[in-house]
A protein has these predicted regions:
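Sec-dependent N-terminal signal peptides
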Residues: 4-14
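ER-lumen resident redox/N-glycosylation machinery signature
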Residues: 62-71, 76-88, 113, 127-130
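Non-catalytic, surface beta->alpha helical segment in thiol-disulfide oxidoreductase systems
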Residues: 101-139
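Local sequence-structure signature of Cys/Sec-based thiol-disulfide redox active-site neighborhoods
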Residues: 26-72
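Structural micro-motif
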Residues: 91-103
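Solvent-exposed loop/turn segments at secondary-structure junctions
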Residues: 58-61, 83-86, 94, 106-108
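Boundary at the C-terminal end of the N-terminal hydrophobic targeting segment
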Residues: 18-20
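Structural recognition of the beta-strand scaffold that forms the well-ordered cores
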Residues: 51-54, 78, 98, 110
Length: 139
């Protein structure tokens, strides 16, 4: 019984802090999604920063992308799929977490959780993809 209570408290804490650790300015929804993924320019159209969007769900908050604040040379956003049904449908989000890398509003790469609800990637792989997209856009 003590184990069950400890487990329940751990899960509740993870759910609460998984959403809280990402400030409100990084959360997007149906109404501002297109604007956000198309808005980040460094110096002009060729220098748009890539956008990393994590599709998140409270039921799987424990498996969220915890290293979001370590991403370099890109902008990060998080979408609560329960509050963004149109985006979820458009990008065929079936599992959370799912991460999509955009450049200039175009989907460049995608990582989806499997049936185990675990994200099959890490910060290094995502950063590598960001670096490749940034390098490719210079030519």
């Amino acid at each position: 019984m003590k184990f069950k209570i400890t487990l329940l408290l751990t899960l509740i804490t993870n759910i609460i802090f998984a959403q809280v650790d990402v400030p409100a300015k990084y959360w997007i929804e149906d109404s501002n999604f297109e604007e956000k993924i198309n808005a980040h320019h460094a110096f002009g159209d060729d220098d748009k920063l890539p956008i990393v969007v994590e599709f998140w769900a409270s039921f799987n908050a424990a498996n969220c992308f915890a290293d979001w604040n370590k991403i370099e040379n890109a902008v990060y956003y998080r979408v609560d799929i329960s509050k963004a049904p149109n985006i979820k449908k458009e990008y065929r989000i079936r599992m959370a977490p799912t991460i999509i890398l955009f450049k200039g509003g175009v989907k460049e790469d995608m990582w989806k959780a499997g049936l185990d609800l675990m994200l099959p990637t890490d910060l290094n792989e995502i950063q590598e993809a960001i670096n490749e997209v940034n390098t490719a856009s210079r030519f």
